[in-house]
Regions:
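Catalytic P-loop NTP-binding/switch module of NTPases
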Residues: 283-299
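Glycine-rich phosphate-binding loop of actin/hexokinase-like ATP-binding domains
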Residues: 202, 248-288
Length: 322
């Protein structure tokens, strides 16, 4: 499932979609709880995956045919987003209606009903932090799953700065970046190796708890049971970056309508994620104001003639706008 949601050997943690503080919560236990919610959705046979953006809301209904790692897409639909700005919900009623309508349209396309949903979160002031821990390997000298769990549980989430209390933020993802065994660094999977001291470096992505709660509330209001929330930056990178790109190091920038999600990968792991509160809509506004076009005309011009790469052919001649 790692290529789809980031589960599997990464032991990635998702926060409780209904919220909750990070201070004393056990990351590994929360990961297990997340897996249980996904298994419940799998037993139902299908669920909705929602990309809740500032400009549009995209929905896909996927079906599990025995293997959770290989879901099948039954239907896809997208609608103009409402109630979302810069990647966060700012009008609950509008966002709930947009989600409800998009899911209903996708259900008609798929010919099925869904009752569970996984959603993305772009905003919420994402913050990358690191944590590390070292524990003694259990008797016998070979690293077991229990030793891995022990090391992960020994990691403590760094406290927030003085301007924010720890209770104001919640963990969205927590993922081991590398393992150390008796001073040997850069291990991908220590299980089965012999040693005395096992260490782990953990990347933790936290977001504002209120942003998480609002996503969960919007899903519940739309009669959907939330099974998880995923960072847009992380999900975009998993869908775009090849395995060797993730291993050797790569950045992924998801230029959205109202905000852009940025993620960095190294050695196959997410090592940094952030949000830039600028997106394609701001480019459209610049074109509109600079040339005196209305917004729709500027958006059309941007889509048809704009490019993220400066090409020689684009520097010559006039562009028709009529």
């Amino acid at each position: 499932m790692r290529d789809f949601l980031g589960f599997g050997e990464t032991l990635m943690d998702h926060a409780d979609p209904r919220g909750g503080s990070t201070g004393s919560r056990d990351l590994y236990a929360r990961h297990r709880a997340m897996r249980e919610r996904l298994r419940a959705a799998q037993r139902q046979g299908r669920m909705a995956v929602l990309d809740i953006g500032s400009f549009k809301i995209c929905c896909a209904i996927i079906e599990f045919d025995g293997d959770i790692a290989s879901p099948r897409v039954l239907g896809v639909a997208q609608l103009r987003s409402r109630g979302v700005r810069a990647g966060v919900i700012v009008d609950m009623a509008e966002a709930e209606q947009a989600i409800r309508q998009d899911v209903a349209q996708t259900e008609r396309a798929a010919g099925v009903r869904v009752y569970h949903a996984l959603a993305t979160l772009t905003g919420g002031f994402p913050r990358s932090q690191t944590a590390a821990a070292e524990v003694a390997v259990s008797e016998g000298g070979r690293v077991t799953e229990a030793d891995v769990v022990h090391a992960l549980r020994a990691c403590k989430i760094p406290s927030s700065g003085p301007a924010e209390t720890a209770e104001a933020r919640t963990t969205l993802h927590a993922q081991p970046v590398s393992w150390t065994l008796d001073g040997e660094h850069g291990l991908r999977d220590p299980k089965g190796l012999s040693g005395r001291r096992l260490g782990v470096d953990l990347h933790i992505l936290t977001v504002a708890e209120s942003a998480m709660r609002n996503v969960a509330t919007a899903l519940l209001s739309a009669d959907l049971e939330p099974v998880g929330v995923v960072s847009t930056a992380y999900a975009s990178a998993l869908s775009c970056l090849m395995g060797d790109e993730q291993d050797h190091g790569a950045a992924c920038i998801d230029l959205g309508g109202g905000a852009s999600a940025v993620s960095l990968f190294l050695r196959g792991r997410l090592v940094f994620a952030d949000l830039v509160r600028l997106g394609g809509e701001h480019v459209t506004l610049d074109v509109s104001r600079g040339f005196g076009f209305d917004f729709d005309a500027a958006e059309r011009l941007k889509i048809l003639e704009g490019s993220a790469i400066a090409l020689g052919s684009s520097m010559r001649g006039a562009i028709g706008v009529g």
